[in-house]
Amino acid sequence: MGRSPCCEKAHTNRGAWTKEEDERLVAYVRAHGEGCWRSLPRAAGLLRCGKSCRLRWINYLRPDLKRGNFTADEDDLIVKLHSLLGNKWSLIAARLPGRTDNEIKNYWNTHIRRKLLGSGIDPVTHRRVAGGAATTISFQPSPNTAVAAAAETAAQAPIKAEETAAVKAPRCPDLNLDLCISPPCQHEDDGEEEEEELDLIKPAVVKREALQAGHGHGHGLCLGCGLGGQKGAAGCSCSNGHHFLGLRTSVLDFRGLEMK
């Protein structure tokens, strides 16, 4: 056999309590005490369930109830009792005078539980969560990591700059891809060197041409005069007193003159 209902559902009010119902319940409890909650509604003239009357009295109408927010000492006591008793809110409320089990349960779920999670503590086991106090994943780099990354970037910057310069530097800077016929480019230094070489070669070429010209006109130059000998000396076979350019040697030959 099951337990009989405490009241008739057909004649029972449901919903929010009115001010008149609260006054009747308070007056009856003050006059007769709490007594039996199953018979209290009929004796007090209330069309309410016995359970509803009990919860209304305990949670809202008791004169010793504390009003206001929980204090820091109460928070610490609730955490300690919860670590020992778990979710047995009635036993926890018995050790907190002026607080109800329903009030403590609501306060635990809305405030203390979130506070423990924010501190890195598991609200069920009351032990620190693996991974430290931070329960949320942060994508911001730590200061030490940021400094190390900046130093590494600064160290790699010159190397990357050198590699970029080496890649961008042309392998053949003087290469001309224009398809046209033009004289080769000559530098000023090359021109000066060529002029010096021409100055060294020119006397020999002129001397050779002069020898050929002398033979062509029948005025040959003897070997002795060609080697620097004196004109008209012994062994000189120059004809008509002309040198290799066709001029008279007596006019251009100053070697016979004595310096005074």
Swiss-Prot record:
A biological process from GO: negative regulation of DNA-templated transcription
Major localisation:
nucleus
Task: Cite the HTH myb-type domain residue spans from the record.
Answer: 9-61, 62-116
Keyword Transcription regulation in the entry? The reply is yes
Places the protein is found: Nucleus
Task: Give any Gene Ontology cellular component.
Answer: nucleus
Disulfide bridge partners, by residue number: none
On tissue specificity, the annotation reads:
Mainly expressed in the aerial parts and, to a lower extent, in roots.
- Pfam families xrefs: Myb_DNA-binding
Q: Write one Gene Ontology MF term.
A: DNA-binding transcription factor activity
Which PANTHER family has this protein been placed in? F14D16.11-RELATED
Stated role = Transcription factor that negatively regulates the expression of caffeic acid O-methyl-transferase genes (COMTs) and of other genes involved in the biosynthesis of lignin, thus preventing lignification.
Instruction: Please give the name of this protein.
Output: Myb transcription factor 42
Q: Which organism is it from?
A: Zea mays (Maize)
